[in-house]
Amino acid sequence: MDAPKAGYAFEYLIETLNDSSHKKFFDVSKLGTKYDVLPYSIRVLLEAAVRNCDGFLMKKEDVMNILDWKTKQSNVEVPFFPARVLLQDFTGIPAMVDFAAMREAVKTLGGDPEKVHPACPTDLTVDHSLQIDFSKCAIQNAPNPGGGDLQKAGKLSPLKVQPKKLPCRGQTTCRGSCDSGELGRNSGTFSSQIENTPILCPFHLQPVPEPETVLKNQEVEFGRNRERLQFFKWSSRVFKNVAVIPPGTGMAHQINLEYLSRVVFEEKDLLFPDSVVGTDSHITMVNGLGILGWGVGGIETEAVMLGLPVSLTLPEVVGCELTGSSNPFVTSIDVVLGITKHLRQVGVAGKFVEFFGSGVSQLSIVDRTTIANMCPEYGAILSFFPVDNVTLKHLEHTGFSKAKLESMETYLKAVKLFRNDQNSSGEPEYSQVIQINLNSIVPSVSGPKRPQDRVAVTDMKSDFQACLNEKVGFKGFQIAAEKQKDIVSIHYEGSEYKLSHGSVVIAAVISCTNNCNPSVMLAAGLLAKKAVEAGLRVKPYIRTSLSPGSGMVTHYLSSSGVLPYLSKLGFEIVGYGCSICVGNTAPLSDAVLNAVKQGDLVTCGILSGNKNFEGRLCDCVRANYLASPPLVVAYAIAGTVNIDFQTEPLGTDPTGKNIYLHDIWPSREEVHRVEEEHVILSMFKALKDKIEMGNKRWNSLEAPDSVLFPWDLKSTYIRCPSFFDKLTKEPIALQAIENAHVLLYLGDSVTTDHISPAGSIARNSAAAKYLTNRGLTPREFNSYGARRGNDAVMTRGTFANIKLFNKFIGKPAPKTIHFPSGQTLDVFEAAELYQKEGIPLIILAGKKYGSGNSRDWAAKGPYLLGVKAVLAESYEKIHKDHLIGIGIAPLQFLPGENADSLGLSGRETFSLTFPEELSPGITLNIQTSTGKVFSVIASFEDDVEITLYKHGGLLNFVARKFS
């Protein structure tokens, strides 16, 4: 099916770009003054509507509704044609299997199967198939800064238990187990080992990234998933518009952001904004790059691939104005968390958020994409940052050519999609405007005993004094007033030092769960560089350490040139596992310990970890503060938390000049520049090389290149589905539903997980019996999610949820009654009997049928069971669309009526005739075997849905188009 012809009704808007490229584009800004006040995100929706307006799937009325967004928001549904689709392997399998099956159907109908291709660019990332079978579970030694391999940290061994693990964000392997091995059975030995084994948490310890481990895991991955990988490789060969990113390359969201994003699309010399929908939960991240995108279900992405739009309610758009300048000591993490916290408090659920104002230019692309990625935290559909100069600078660093960037900028400015701080005229109008003054976001620390006790850095000195005075409790230490100024002298390494209340004795820079943003680690390194150059040092008795979360952190600290300066201040790399923050601290010197005991001093530990409970770092260190990495370095240099950074110096330079924190604190611009040059560029180059080179196993993987896929009849993962078995060249007239039995009588809020569970396959289920009969053991069953490419498994798994409550049964169970025989059977077995007897089926349900996550098999499964219609009080809209898309009629009780009020038992048979001229919302009559007649609503909303239903669903509709 060809993509819709470019805006037949709006050809008069086509212009030629005023540059050397002479590309064409739709100048939507010529639609009038209404366009000028639209939010940027709505302008992207409008451009797509204009470009794809064909009078059927996209009507002129839809274009006008978007243009009139100000009055139509939240009231109308509009279609949207995204520029591209992003799939992961789990959701990609059923979509590509359907396309492969469609080729078979088109050939059967006498058409050319080679015409069957996705209608838009489709990228499929294989990043959900890796399981960790081999790992190393000891704390790793630091790499040699001068080069050389990592020292081996543990014995490579296959794990005894191999649960399915999804890849962790931003890496191709999951962090390993913290299990240190089989403990001895002797109780004394067991107790001793517990006391002496480092406590490792799964968020911090990673498998050793040595070739031996990676290669062994990849070898198992390719063996375990060979069928699927061969199918994906065949798909990438025969389908135009399909690109497969092989396993071992990276995470879907990382690849989408750093490699697949175009910002501006070019197709047949026509320019238009990049946009994307996909099944990756991190899809919203690209909005930070000025690319409109959000997550949808598998069936929606497949619909887009088949040439149909996604549908959305025209959203409210909350304008978030960023003003002021951030406090010089504020880090990127402070800003990101401050903004997301504010959005959560305001309430933006189900809305678009769009950022504007002078403060936006202070946010790096990393900041923006992080905020955009945190949409689930505050409930927004997406958070959009229009393209600006910061975006272009980032794209320059990630490989875009100068000519491409110039063309991009010219186009975006021509259609008023480029944000310019210097030109505030014609600012968009928003549903609501909220203001966040970046000055209001202040740097803070947490402590001295609990993570939730936040203290602004400006209040640190007074707060610590208050803690000394307060009674012993969550914050207090109850130190007598006359002892609060006590000083104890110590001799250490030939010099004399003085300790007092507030003295820092432990300082640890840790890149872990809450400080993995590169900018804060680089800020710590840049601060260390400036401190060393100013002649500042950390007192030698302070236990300093640097624990990167991964080798990547070490790489960019080294490549940016700041690692030697951290080392100069004593922040040497100690390892890559949990250490300081779980209490695995090197012991303090005897001199310090004796001084603390002698003066009963409240000394301090300061770290950039996530736990600071009293005594956690060391029994004798009573005050522990969590801080950003640069603040850890700053307090270590100061040697005390009892300091006001605004008025008191950190120390003096060799000439005796006072050096204050503001003298050595790196600016955000400086940090962003180094981040772009030494992190973003490095990561992009590594990713690009990986994708373009592939890997040996993928490159050598044999796969067919035939027009039709050679289905393996023995395969339990990939089968040619039966959706097209009865497909005819032309759609036949709508058939009456005669004497249909009720397969299931369900209540309210039946979810898609009740209908099509995605979890493990129960050993006593119909799917398990099918797999067992094909020689598989229970350990080899895998999950329903992994077998989405096998319709036989998925059909047997339909309504197989053990929590399904069928009123015929009276208790939760995946069972029903086969009424002709009176038997209680598995749902699949009953449906199979009905089909053999030629009896059509319907489902009775209550309110919100099909709620929960979008799931394609929640519609496909019932269809293959023989369900012709669902009769419910109300539907989750997305699921109702799915039912129509597969050819099941969504019928709805009249308002105020339901099965109970009509006296239906579900044991009757039901008959229904469709009129020749079916129209949206038409009322139909159902007659039961008891003689009762009642009216229902055929819940079709427009002519497109009726057309799809008459064709027997979306797949049949498209197959006929191709044939």
Swiss-Prot record:
Main localization of the protein described in the UniProt heading: cytoplasm
Gene3D superfamilies associated with the record: 6.10.190.10, Aconitase, domain 3, Aconitase, domain 4
Annotated [4Fe-4S] cluster binding sites: C512, C578, C581
Cofactor: binding comment: Binds 1 [4Fe-4S] cluster per subunit. [4Fe-4S]-binding affects RNA-binding activity, thereby inhibiting activity of the protein.
Post-translational modification summary for this protein: Ubiquitinated and degraded by the proteasome in presence of high level of iron and oxygen. Ubiquitinated by a SCF complex containing FBXL5. Upon iron and oxygen depletion FBXL5 is degraded, preventing ubiquitination and allowing its RNA-binding activity.
Keyword terms, alphabetized: 4Fe-4S, Cytoplasm, Disease variant, Iron, Iron-sulfur, Metal-binding, Neurodegeneration, RNA-binding, Ubl conjugation
GO cellular component entries: cytoplasm; cytosol
CDD domains: AcnA_IRP (cd01586), AcnA_IRP_Swivel (cd01580)
Localization of this protein: Cytoplasm
GO annotation, biological process: erythrocyte homeostasis; intestinal absorption; intracellular iron ion homeostasis; mRNA stabilization; multicellular organismal-level iron ion homeostasis; osteoclast differentiation; post-embryonic development; protoporphyrinogen IX biosynthetic process
Database matches in Pfam families: Aconitase (PF00330), Aconitase_C (PF00694)
GO MF annotations in UniProt: 4 iron, 4 sulfur cluster binding; aconitate hydratase activity; iron-responsive element binding; metal ion binding; mRNA regulatory element binding translation repressor activity; RNA binding
Illness: Neurodegeneration, early-onset, with choreoathetoid movements and microcytic anemia: An autosomal recessive disorder characterized by severe neurological and extra-neurological manifestations. Clinical features include early-onset global developmental delay, absent speech, dystonia, spasticity, choreoathetoid movement disorder, seizures, and microcytic hypochromic anaemia unresponsive to iron supplementation.
Function of the molecule: RNA-binding protein that binds to iron-responsive elements (IRES), which are stem-loop structures found in the 5'-UTR of ferritin, and delta aminolevulinic acid synthase mRNAs, and in the 3'-UTR of transferrin receptor mRNA. Binding to the IRE element in ferritin results in the repression of its mRNA translation. Binding of the protein to the transferrin receptor mRNA inhibits the degradation of this otherwise rapidly degraded mRNA.
Name the record gives this protein: Iron-responsive element-binding protein 2
Source organism (scientific name): Homo sapiens (Human)
Source organism phylogeny: Eukaryota, Metazoa, Chordata, Craniata, Vertebrata
